[in-house]
A protein has these predicted regions:
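Bacterial N-terminal signal peptides that target proteins for export
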Residues: 2-16
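C-terminal motif of bacterial Sec signal peptides marking the signal peptidase cleavage site
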Residues: 22-25
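Immediate post-signal-peptide N-terminus of mature secreted/exported proteins
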Residues: 27-78, 174-178
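Short, charged, amphipathic alpha-helical segments
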Residues: 36, 67-78, 103-110, 114, ...
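Amphipathic alpha-helical coiled-coil/heptad-repeat segments
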Residues: 45, 52, 56, 80-83, ...
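Short, solvent-exposed, charged loop/turn and helix-capping segments
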Residues: 85-110, 122-134, 159
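A charged, solvent-exposed segment within the mature domains of Sec-exported extracytoplasmic proteins
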Residues: 123-179
Length: 179
């Protein structure tokens, strides 16, 4: 009898703990908390992308061999790809903001960062596949890869017109992490 009660109590504890997790998972972070988390995720990403842009421009004009330029560009684009995935993952970890259409807002941010990650990955793969035997064709290939990257990057921008949230707009304007 005692064993049966202990087993029942143990099952009840597990059910209650699971229910508590489910209920706790229903409410997402406040708009301010979510905006702060997103800005903390995007700040290092922006810095990395800025560094990439500057470094790519330098590589395109530097007096290096095609093999050196290829190695440097592949490394730079791999870094941007990794930074984009890290930012995407951190936005995912921020959860869903407690606002109307919060799921769509979070998914939009994650989707945009995922598309950027993929664009950098494709640019890295394209440049890694270029032949470095002749400088002219190599740099033409690099320019084409960067042009494609820029188009894909522009196309991956988050369309905020459908995800407009006054609470999130205010939060992004107010939290110190976003300044």
């Amino acid at each position: 009898m005692r064993t049966r009660r202990a087993a029942t109590a143990g099952k009840l504890t597990v059910v209650l703990a699971t229910l508590a997790l489910v209920v706790a998972g229903c409410g997402g972070p406040s708009p301010r908390a979510w905006a702060a988390s997103v800005c903390q995720a995007l700040s290092p990403w922006r810095a990395e992308i800025s560094k990439l842009t500057s470094s790519t421009q330098q590589q395109m004009t530097a007096q290096t061999t095609p093999a050196q330029a290829k190695e440097n560009l592949v490394r730079l684009f791999a870094g941007a790809e990794e930074a984009s995935e890290t930012a995407r993952r951190k936005v995912e970890e921020a959860g869903v903001p407690e606002v109307e259409r919060g799921t769509e807002v979070s998914a939009g941010f994650q989707g945009s960062l995922g598309k950027m990650r993929d664009a950098y990955g494709r640019a890295r793969t394209t440049i890694d596949g270029l032949d470095t035997a002749q400088a002219g064709p190599f740099y033409d290939g690099v320019r084409a890869a960067v042009d494609t990257l820029n188009k894909e990057y522009d196309a991956s921008a988050l369309d905020t017109s459908k995800l407009d949230s006054p609470e999130l707009k205010q939060a992004f304007d107010e939290v110190p992490e976003c300044r």
